[in-house]
From Swiss-Prot:
Protein name: Phosphoglycerate kinase
InterPro entries: Phosphoglycerate_kinase, Phosphoglycerate_kinase_CS, Phosphoglycerate_kinase_N, Phosphoglycerate_kinase_sf
Keyword Nucleotide-binding: yes
Encoding gene per record: pgk
Domain of life: Bacteria
Keyword field: ATP-binding, Cytoplasm, Glycolysis, Kinase, Nucleotide-binding, Transferase
Catalytic reaction list: (2R)-3-phosphoglycerate + ATP = (2R)-3-phospho-glyceroyl phosphate + ADP
Primary site of residence: cytoplasm
Organism: Aliivibrio fischeri (strain ATCC 700601 / ES114) (Vibrio fischeri)
Matches recorded under Pfam families: PGK
Chain residues that bind ATP: 197, 314, 340-343
GO BP field: gluconeogenesis; glycolytic process
Length: 387
């Protein structure tokens, strides 16, 4: 895909409007998880060091659109940036009719969702955003799947629209994993339901050499092989779909599983062959043989795309499958991309962050990209690059 990159532009003296993803959890006026801000800092620093007049904005939470609500203010983010950048960062509340900035100065524009017309991508608001800048930088992959005034409309109307370093890296990594992957490509899809990941599974079944399924999704595939899954979470109405997918793509299905009689953190894990699962059993994880077999598949992969844990890894007795998969990915010499909330939690839990080639910052956007959907913000950047 062809987009203009911020790093290729002359920024000195220019008014630069960065749409970042600063939607971070806040408690008692303090940022409690700074991962998204940390991811955005390099882009902000690059602009400041280049002598640009820098504006950065984001949404935060879900306020009623068009109404100011202190609970959803970006003020805690401004306080964080003051410390992180060791400079005076201002928060602008009324900015739609213009604001004055000096070169090397940073202003945070208050929560875009306080502006009426943001979510509906209204032209009037988009043009007001665009009038603030010489260069619009889209750097929020996490909201690239939404056509909103601050992610799409502004870019259509700004003098120049480009991809920030974070977004550019994301598109490059996902493109490398999906558009032109080194083979074999192994995709791992976990999660509770086939229905929520059906488009992902269908899309990946067409490009993956092997498609590994885990979590509740795997139970539907175990049932599709004719085995009893007891009281496990599975979708009987999607068994035929699972069988169809298994004909189209190599999907290694678990041969042994970790079961219990109740969904309980302290429940003892009972390892069983899939043919031995009883009517009152609930499958919560892969068994050791299945984990070892999948680890070997991952070990031979040249490209790995990972979305979702393969068991109830939050419970100590049912973490072995996801731990084994994580270890195999960490030890793999292949190019690995991971994304999705639960996946990131697993990466943190098993301490493999440094060993994954690329960790995606987007939840819904990551899934939509993997589904093969066009992301509106990316389509806008491609269109502007042609102009």
């Amino acid at each position: 895909m062809s987009v203009i990159k911020m790093t290729d532009l002359e920024l000195a003296g220019k008014r630069v409007f960065i749409r970042a993803d600063l939607n971070v959890p806040v408690k008692d006026g303090k940022v409690t998880s700074d991962a998204r801000i940390l991811a955005s800092l390099p882009t902000i620093k690059l602009c400041l060091e280049a002598g640009a007049k820098v504006m950065v904005t984001s949404h935060l939470g879900r306020p009623t659109e068009g109404e100011y609500n202190e609970e959803f203010s970006l003020a805690p983010v401004v306080n964080y940036l003051n410390d992180a950048l060791d400079c005076d960062v201002k928060l602008a509340k009324d900015y739609l009719d213009g604001l004055e900035l000096n070169a090397g100065e940073l202003v945070v524009l208050e929560n875009v969702r306080f502006n009426k017309g943001e979510k509906k991508n209204e032209e009037e608001l988009s043009k007001k955003y665009a009038a603030l800048c010489d260069i619009f930088v889209m750097d929020a992959f996490g909201t690239a799947h939404r056509a909103q005034a601050s992610t799409h409309g502004v870019g259509m109307n700004a003098p120049v629209a480009c991809a920030g370093p974070l977004l550019a890296a994301e598109l490059e990594a996902l493109g490398k994993a999906m558009s032109n992957p080194e083979r074999p490509l192994v995709a791992i899809v976990g999660g509770s339901k086939v229905s929520t990941k059906l488009t992902v599974l269908e899309s990946l079944s067409k490009i993956a050499d092997q498609l590994v399924v885990g979590g509740g999704i795997a139970n539907t595939f175990i049932a599709a092989e004719g085995h009893n899954v007891g009281k496990s979470l599975y979708e009987a109405d999607l068994v035929e779909t699972a069988q169809k997918l298994m004909k189209e793509c190599a999907i290694p299905v678990a041969t042994d599983v970790a079961c219990a009689k109740a969904f309980d953190e302290n429940a003892e894990a009972e390892i069983k062959h899939v043919s031995e699962v009883q009517d009152d059993d609930m499958i919560f994880d892969l068994g050791p043989d299945s984990t070892a077999a999948l680890a070997e598949i991952i070990g031979n992969a040249k490209t790995i795309l990972w979305n979702g844990p393969v068991g109830v890894f939050e419970f100590k007795n049912f973490e072995a499958g996801t731990a084994g998969i994580s270890k195999a990915i960490a030890e793999s010499a292949g190019f690995s991309v991971a994304g999705g909330g639960d996946t990131l939690a697993a990466i943190d839990k098993f301490g493999i962050k440094a060993d994954v080639s690329y960790i995606s910052t987007g939840g819904g956007a990551f899934l939509e990209f993997v589904e093969g959907k066009v992301l509106p913000a990316v389509a806008m950047l491609e269109e502007r690059a042609k102009a």
